[in-house]
Structure formats: structure tokens, C-alpha cells
């Protein structure tokens, strides 16, 4: 099932450069069902400068949690894209076995497609598509019920 809507919201924050912000976007919700029940949604929001998506997983009966066994979300960038990335370190390493602790160094203008130290990269990730601009890939969460 597909549901589309237009988002037009205004909010205020006291501690940012522009305290009153108007957010306009289009939203599409793709629902995935099994045996007539919605299992999860993939929700996309697209605005003039942003693309965002999230997964919403629905409780099944009395079960209020789930196990994600594999994550296959990915991003593809054009050939020649360079990066400004922080490699993810192996877990339980470094000082007092506190890794990953976001204290590794960012590498500038590396070619896209490498895999850091074999563990991927830490968000946020910044990609440069030559003279065509930059792409920031990051993560955020807004509620416990949204994965």
C-alpha cells in the first residue's frame, strides 16, 4: 500500500541561527503486510534540499520487540566521488576497551568504496561529487517505536 501526503510545518528553536523554520516536504509511506497485517512501513520525505527515510516496525500481538538479523540499506554515489569519513573501529578495543568511541580520525578526500578498517564508517558521512556538490548522510531517531 502507498500513502502520499504534503508536509508543511513551522517550528521555532531559540538556539539556532534562524529561530523560526518552515519545513515543506512530500511524504510517501510504503506499507509491507503479511497475512493482512502491516508488518512495517518505509517512510520517505523529500524536500528541496533533503531526502530522509525511516523504518517503522509494528508490534505483532503481545510481542513489543523485534530482532533485525541483517541490515542491507545502502547508498550508491557516482564514480569519482570522494569522502570525508571516520572509520568505524572494531568493538571492545582501544583505551580501556571503549571502542568504538568516535575518537578515530576523519580521512579527507578518500575515494568512495573503501571500507575503513573493515568495519565500515561512523555517521555522519560526507561525500563530495566533484564540483557538483556535497551529500551528508547521517542518522537520527525521533521515538522509541521508530527504527
Where do the PLM segments sit?
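N-terminal accessory beta-strand-rich subdomains and adjacent acidic, glycine-rich linkers
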Residues: 1-147
Amino acid at each position: 500500500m502507498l500513502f502520499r501526503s504534503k508536509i508543511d510545518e513551522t517550528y521555532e528553536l531559540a538556539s539556532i541561527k534562524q529561530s523560526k523554520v518552515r519545513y515543506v516536504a512530500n511524504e510517501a509511506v510504503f506499507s509491507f503486510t503479511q497475512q493482512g497485517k502491516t508488518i512495517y512501513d518505509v517512510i520517505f520525505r523529500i524536500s528541496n534540499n533533503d531526502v530522509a527515510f525511516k523504518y517503522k516496525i509494528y508490534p505483532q500481538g503481545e510481542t513489543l520487540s523485534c530482532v533485525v538479523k541483517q541490515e542491507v540499506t545502502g547508498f550508491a554515489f557516482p564514480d569519482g566521488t570522494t569522502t570525508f569519513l571516520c572509520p568505524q573501529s572494531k568493538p571492545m578495543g582501544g583505551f580501556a576497551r571503549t571502542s568504538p568511541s568516535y575518537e578515530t580520525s576523519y580521512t579527507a578526500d578518500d575515494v568512495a568504496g573503501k571500507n575503513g578498517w573493515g568495519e565500515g564508517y561512523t555517521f555522519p558521512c560526507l561525500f563530495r561529487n566533484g564540483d557538483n556538490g556535497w551529500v551528508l548522510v547521517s542518522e537520527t531517531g525521533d521515538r522509541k517505536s521508530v527504527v
